[in-house]
């Protein structure tokens, strides 16, 4: 199974590819990086993930780039890790919340649903770029 994550300072959005369908999963709320990396490691183990797709911004965001790489090194995972450009994935995900009112959009942003929809976009890009080549 393939899992994607959108690593943020407060939440980690999660999406999975199941039988060819991309599904958002419950986001990991991040209290500190050790707890978050442990939670992600546990999820990867429980779901028997073979490939972890990680969203990363372009090189001009050096601090974020380094922070994401450092976080992923804390994750206990022996499978394949693939980094995919995440630029605008959160903007695209936010557009998917158009049907929600202002208050519900705010709630979706805070509870991690937006982050997991962003992880869906990252997983879509992986499927388009990597799986289509095979």
From Swiss-Prot:
Database matches in InterPro entries: RNaseH-like_sf, YqgF, YqgF/RNaseH-like_dom, YqgF/RNaseH-like_dom_sf
Keyword terms, alphabetized: Cytoplasm, Hydrolase, Nuclease, Ribosome biogenesis
EC number: 3.1.-.-
GO biological process, one term: rRNA 5'-end processing
Signal peptide region: none
NCBIfam families: PRK00109.2-2
Function: Could be a nuclease involved in processing of the 5'-end of pre-16S rRNA.
Family: Belongs to the YqgF nuclease family.
Protein name: Putative pre-16S rRNA nuclease
Species assigned in the record: Helicobacter pylori (strain J99 / ATCC 700824)
